[in-house]
Amino acid sequence: MTVRGRTSMSQGQVPYKELLSAARKAEPQALEMLGELVRFPSCAARDHKTIVECADHVEAHLRGFGYSAKQFPTKGSPVVYAVKDVGAEKSLLLYHHYDVQPEDPLDLWKSDPWKLEVRDGRVFGRGVVDNKGPYVADLLGLDLLERSLGKLPVNVKFLVEGEEEVGSVHLGDFTRENASFLKSDGAVNEMLVSTPGSPSEIYCGVKGDVYFELKAGGSPTFPNRDVHSGYANAIPNAAWRLIWALSTLKDKDDRITIDGWDALVREISEEDRAALTEYSEDLGAALKADYGLGKTLLGREGLELVESVFMSPSVTISGFGSGYQGPGSKTIVPCSASAKVDFRLVPDLTPDKAEELLKAHLVKKGFGDIEVTMLDTAFDPSKTPITDPFIRLVRECSSEVVAPARCSVLPMGFGSGPVELFARYAPTCFAWSRADSSGTNLHAPNESWPVGSLSNEMAFVALVAQRLGSS
């Protein structure tokens, strides 16, 4: 790609209200584009042909809006990446993904998940929130800004991958070979802004994540097949063995008891603790209302709950399987058992270190026979300093969309993602903006987004690009 000489931008500023007005007029176009994308059942774990077709469509989208767009082939889904170099001094990178969660269970959908439907002021379809809707909104929002000013105030880069929902398995191949593309003056990860009056959160980083499968069985310690439970006092039970092993990982007060774990958890800085203290939402009330809880785990509330969710590591049994699970009864001693365990990591824990500590802990506790396998792609935690100017810029923009008192900046998000794959090869400031997701049914049937959120997102990304260009 030929890079033109850099020039300083001197265009005027378009007020947010004008950006929002233009965005609302563009809603029909946004819905049409989103409908075209929703019709692709682009599930990375299922149908490679549809994934490729969706990637081709995204590439064509970007080319149609004047971007120099390409595909990076991988052993899985292709990565679509695009640049619009206007010769500006600064560059903005936007990360999105075109793959989606499967539609299962289909019978719980009130409309076809692969056909966009608008009803009751909301747009329904798989991927409208995660993440095809935000991608369309960002693409159109930047186009609106370009047409308003005559020229974009920043160079814009889009990275749209196709494996986010399965752990970004091959994204590292792209980031390793395209460090120059990743360089920017600010990057946003799945930017998603709230509707006015609802809360908005800006994360300066994300937790790491590593997923293990633990197995008992398959050795002479256990029977080579399920056994009549009349022999229960004579035959080792793989299910009990695995349950006892898992019980050593945490105590009844929810403390992780893996030897050496706490020593690797970085102390919370004064700046980060101050941000947690200023968190504007009642997290406990929100969680209880959303999930029908009488109380949170251990009754945590206030700052204790906020710190535990956003700044603490976790060990979670995500699934357990053993023995007979069918209707009625079957009296057996199981010969095998397995569990899926999810570890969320904070600095300075890493997936490799977590695996090392877990295996050593099990051996020390007398469970060296438990087989430990790391599954899928693992991510290191990644964090931008909360004092970074780009973080401040994104917060200022978000505060114009929602009430300033409802906009919070948090040192890290509660989730995980491939941010560290970017930071590893081209250090840059990542801001992950997250809206109030209640009612969106993310990863569930009837995924939906308020129609007005499309225009809010368009105006928001235009405002971010405009402010970055003049900063």
Where are these regions (language model features)?
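Short amphipathic alpha-helices in soluble, non-transmembrane regions
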Residues: 354-362
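Short, low-order "capping/linker" segments at domain edges
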Residues: 381-400
